[in-house]
Amino acid sequence: LKALGATDVLSLSAVGGLRADLPPGTFVVVDQFIDRTFAREKSFFGAGCVAHVSMAHPVCPRLGDHVQATLAGLGVPLVRGGTYLAMEGPQFSTLAESRMYRSWNCDVIGMTNMPEAKLAREAELCYASVSMVTDFDCWHPAHDAVTVDAIIRVLLGNADRARSLVTALTAPITTDP
C-alpha cells in the first residue's frame, strides 16, 4: 500500500463484544490491541534487518477522529476507544478464554487487525480500525454463544452503515489528472 502511495488505512472488522454495554450493532473505534496470534508473519523486517517500532499508540489519532466524526454524523451507535483482543482462530473462544479476556479489560475480540496494525506502523501508514460488534462472544449468560449464522445476520444489518462510512470517508479523496 505504501509503495502505491497510500497514506491511510482503515480496517473494518466483525468482532465479539466483551462488555455488556457493547451490544451487537455497536461500532467501536478501537485505540489499543492485544496480539494473541501466533501463526502469522508479523513484520516487514527480517533476514538480518532489525527495526523496533513503537506500538504504544497503534491507531492514528487524526484518522480515528475523522472516523468518529463521520460515524456520529451518520447516526451510527459508536464508542471511541477500546482494546481489541486479536486471537488466532479459526475457532471461537472457550468460556474460560472469554472470561480471561474480560478480566484483562479487553473490549472486543476478533481474528483480524493483527498483524495489520503492526505492519501499518512499520510502514508509517496512518491506521484506524472500526470494530463492528456482532455478538457477545460466549461470556454473556443471557445470550447464546457466538455462531457464524448470528455473526452474518448482524453483519448484513451493519453492511449499509459500513458502506456509508467508507463512502463518506473517501468522498473528499481526489486524484491528480
Residue positions per predicted region:
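Glycine-rich phosphate- or other oxyanion-binding loops that anchor nucleotides, phosphorylated ligands
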Residues: 1-139, 145, 149-156, 160, ...
